[in-house]
């Protein structure tokens, strides 16, 4: 056992946070394959038991990205919309709809995702059904983005190192730091992000990690109803990340003219309904609660991309969602 692994596991066993140097070194060993499965399991369990801190999550992100297939040459602002998942809500795929609306409006969207976590369909499931390729390679991604304003990067294709860690995660059988890292590992390194969390206690943690991983501007959101998106069910909690500063924000749908709704208004019961619903959402013909939920998240994205107020972003979003996207799906 290397000295850094020994020091780190000893610290975690007594409930101590890892230093930046320890965290960087230990995750480098994890992703390089120098750590045994037993040591990796002890590391992940120790972090989970103690409670992960931003420095530790950020170190994991940096190490994972060093092993990832990164997209080069995107020299313009771009955005990802995603959540940690696991909120158990069985809602329609709002974040993917928001991404498609943004691209339809001319913003560059670098969508990074996987198959279903908490919904009936994950972003990959939905986009595959809409005809979007899941096989875009690292060499193709930039050109696809500049041509279509949208590129989807299917996570397993860009993070081969995770294949070595998957068996350990499966054996542990509990959420670990890797569940937090997922939304932070976009290989295109977007400048902007809408990041949803299903648990309010990790709202600030994820915002702090975005600062440490150099995202320029973002909203980290925890929606009313314990959703990992802004919802029209009540007041939503959010943190604006900008220039390394964190600002807590309450986003009340009523302030922007949205009618109150309930979680069941945005639920889908199975995969076929989820796939049919996304088409209605993109056409602007879905139930109003779903369209409002898309507009709320779209408005937040527009506000950080355009550098305008939430009110201006919401108005622009509502007008767009009312007519649907220009492309037919």
From Swiss-Prot:
Keywords: Amino-acid biosynthesis, Aromatic amino acid biosynthesis, Glycosyltransferase, Magnesium, Metal-binding, Transferase, Tryptophan biosynthesis
Catalytic activity annotation: N-(5-phospho-beta-D-ribosyl)anthranilate + diphosphate = 5-phospho-alpha-D-ribose 1-diphosphate + anthranilate
Cofactor field: Mg(2+)
Cysteine-cysteine disulfides: none
GO MF annotations in UniProt: anthranilate phosphoribosyltransferase activity; magnesium ion binding
Ranges in a coiled coil: none
Binding annotation for Mg(2+) 2: 228-229
Cellular component annotations (GO), alphabetically ordered: cytosol
Free-text remark on how the cofactor is bound: Binds 2 magnesium ions per monomer.
A Pfam family annotated for this UniProt entry: Glycos_trans_3N
UniProt: anthranilate 1 binding residues: 83, 114
InterPro entries per the UniProt record, alphabetical: Anthranilate_Pribosyl_Tfrase (IPR005940), Glycosyl_Trfase_fam3 (IPR000312), Glycosyl_Trfase_fam3_N_dom (IPR017459), Glycosyl_Trfase_fam3_N_dom_sf (IPR036320), Nuc_phospho_transferase (IPR035902)
Subunit-level organization: Homodimer.
Role of this protein: Catalyzes the transfer of the phosphoribosyl group of 5-phosphorylribose-1-pyrophosphate (PRPP) to anthranilate to yield N-(5'-phosphoribosyl)-anthranilate (PRA).
Protein name as it appears in the record: Anthranilate phosphoribosyltransferase
Organism: Maridesulfovibrio salexigens (strain ATCC 14822 / DSM 2638 / NCIMB 8403 / VKM B-1763)
């Amino acid at each position: 056992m290397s000295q850094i692994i020994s020091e780190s596991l000893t610290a975690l066993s007594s409930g101590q946070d890892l230093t930046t140097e320890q965290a960087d070194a230990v995750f480098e060993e994890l992703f390089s394959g120098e750590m045994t499965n037993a040591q990796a399991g002890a590391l992940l369990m120790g972090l989970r038991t103690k409670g992960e801190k931003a420095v530790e999550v950020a170190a994991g992100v940096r190490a994972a990205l060093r092993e990832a297939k990164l997209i080069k040459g995107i020299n313009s602002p771009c955005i990802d919309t995603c959540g940690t998942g696991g909120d158990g809500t069985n809602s329609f795929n709002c974040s993917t709809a928001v991404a498609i609306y943004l691209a339809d409006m001319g913003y560059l969207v670098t969508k990074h995702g996987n198959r279903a976590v908490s919904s009936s369909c994950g972003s990959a499931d939905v986009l595959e059904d809409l005809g979007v390729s899941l096989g875009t390679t690292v060499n193709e991604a930039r050109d696809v983005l500049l041509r279509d304003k949208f590129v989807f990067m299917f996570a397993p294709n860009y993070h081969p190192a995770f294949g070595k860690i998957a068996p350990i995660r499966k054996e542990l059988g509990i959420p670990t730091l890797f569940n937090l890292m997922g939304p932070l590992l976009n290989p295109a390194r977007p400048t902007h992000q809408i990041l949803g969390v299903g648990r309010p206690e990790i709202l600030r943690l994820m915002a702090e990690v975005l600062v440490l991983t150099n995202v320029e501007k973002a909203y980290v959101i925890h929606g009313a109803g314990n959703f990992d998106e802004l919802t029209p069910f009540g007041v939503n909690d959010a943190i604006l990340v900008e220039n390394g500063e964190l600002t807590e924000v309450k986003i009340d749908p009523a302030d922007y003219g949205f009618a109150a709704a309930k979680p069941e208004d945005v639920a889908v019961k199975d995969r076929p309904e989820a796939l049919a619903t996304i088409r209605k959402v993109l056409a602007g013909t879905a139930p109003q609660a779903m369209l409002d939920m898309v507009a709320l998240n779209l408005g937040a994205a527009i506000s950080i991309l355009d550098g305008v107020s939430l009110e201006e972003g919401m108005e622009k979003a509502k007008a767009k969602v009312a007519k649907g996207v220009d492309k037919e799906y």
